[in-house]
Amino acid sequence: MPSVSRRDLISAGVAVGATACFPRQLLSFARSLPESAAPSLALSAGSWMQQVGKPPYSAGEEGAIINLAQSALVKLFDGKMLSDLQSDADHLGIPAAERVNITLRHAGRIRGSMSAPGKNLGTQVIESVFRAAMDRRYGGPLARWEASGTSLEVWLQVGSSEIDHDARFEKSVLLLGVEGLEIDDHGQSAYYKPSVAITSRYKTDVTLFEALCKKAGLDKDAWKQPDVNVRRTQWLCLPSVSNAHFFGPQLSPVAKLPIPLDSSIAESAYYLIRNQNVSGGTAYLYDPIADSFVGKKTNSVRAAGCLFALSQTLQSNHDIADTETFKIRTAQMARGLLSRTSLTGEGGRVVQGEKTGTLPEEDERDDELPERAGKDAELAEEEESDGELAGVGATALLAAALSAGILRKEFAQEYQQLYRSITSAQKPDGRFITHFGETEESERAANYYSGQALLVLALEAERGNTKALEMCRRAFEPYVFHFKQAPTTAFVGWHVNVWSRIAILTGNHAYADFVFEQTDWLLQWQIKSHRDLRWVGGFSQSGGAPQFSSIVFLEATVRALLLAIRTGDAKRTKNYVDCVRSGLHFCRLLRLEETPSTLLGNPMRCKGGVALGLIDRRVRCDVVQHFITLCLAVEEIKKHLV
């Protein structure tokens, strides 16, 4: 009988999402397996080897297992002893599993996590429930007052395989968030469930290996020794609370688009509104596992970008755009940003106190993010010193946000002042300065500030401003040369947005050709196939896991697709359609709704949030911003995707 490959197991649902953090959907994999694997199933799962055409447990058995665990916890607090629960355990009638773990969480915080042996699965479950409830490692044993609000996860190990010595040193040997890890050195052993990569600071293979060695009482480099056994493990997780309880039903498998556009736009826009402070600004960096906001200074570029996304939403035909509360809160955000501006002697207005930190596309050092040293694994950003000259980026995005609709009506004078500053930032050669008051450009900032400044002019040109259009024309050749000399992903996101608009407005093929040149170059970094199917559709230059910057790159691809459709470029249209479909599947996995709700400290606060990566589930405000504008762009071409 043919066995099910690791790839088949993943494609069947174990890695079908960042819910892939938990292989919950393994339960339905028998219906999804490739034809080559359909006749049989061979999993290293204790006494139920080679189950033919069926998942490890039936739907009825799953329900009985989780019910037994929940009932055991209630009865133990009611004064029952484990011996009193044995008849219930035996009644389950399922043979012992290779390993059972019970994890208890309260408000997303782990309160206990233990395993226990047993003569059958029922005994393993009740014994593990007792041990988890008495676990002293996470704030002491579970107390009665918190029991009613405690979620429970039943983890069942359904497979394992040895990681050969040489393979341990390969890149991405583990499917992080999908597979667990086990180590054994002559009886000194320990294991991690798949969720550890999501909830801990150990977000790479190496850091997991080292931490697990320490847990087993071994030297942190013991995993490198050939006589030490290291195994990857596959698990099934049965949670007591489903995501649907907080986030509503999951997207139907037969849905025409991988992302529900209407609800995604509304929920992500409300995420920014819901997490505003009294000044109108939105939370910069949020950790949904700990339910805490990271205490960092805000970034003016990213704050203005969030307002731009909300402004674009207000100009759309979505129901949310007609909501009075949404209008008021968006205007409040605008006032907060304007309070951080100052007037110039030339009658302009600029945003002050801006950090020259990078935009999402600049942060893509694929392996650096999860491996960053330090307790909080903070994102690397350049801190702006006191008195540093104001950058063009935040001023440009604030101007773009105020350039139309109700915001332009309410802040007409402020917009004109901001616009004057942007027009004054263009140099005689057509390029833009990167910091007001300084003619020498910052090489890094030029890649994205120039596109943001040009976006303001492109939006004006679309409204019939011929002077703005002429300024775009003057900038065209210098920035074409800039890209050809040193192409970078940081440049493409904003410049494709700009020049696709100008190409459609003017019908000039030179602009269209430049858009297609950038997009074709960018798409070489899109992952077309990978053994970790979650990666497919994302973008990565170094071969590491794709990150949140994929959202920016996909929006550029969507805008290039719209241009290809308008210009009748059938070949590119077909290619871009396929790339956009694939990219949307990846971007969907970054939504916090794809994270098991039992891991989230406050699920309702998370609604609409978009994570930094498949494993790093923190939310930064500008990632939400780019997700909103991506969805708005997709709406323009969605009929070509279905």
Question: Locations of the language-model features?
Answer:
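Solenoidal tandem-repeat scaffolds enriched in leucines and small polar residues
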Residues: 421, 425, 430-451, 455-464, ...
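Basic nucleic-acid-binding interfaces
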Residues: 41-244
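Low-complexity, Ser/Thr/Pro/Gly-enriched N-terminal "stalk/linker" regions
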Residues: 246-301, 329-332, 336, 340-354, ...
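Well-ordered alpha-helical scaffold segments within catalytic/enzyme domains
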Residues: 251-258, 304-322, 396-410, 452-465, ...
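Solvent-exposed loop and edge beta-strand segments that line ligand/cofactor-binding
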Residues: 257, 289-304, 347-396, 411, ...
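CBM-like carbohydrate-recognition segments
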Residues: 298, 368, 528-642
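Extended, well-ordered alpha-helical scaffold segments
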Residues: 257-272, 320-340, 390, 409-425, ...
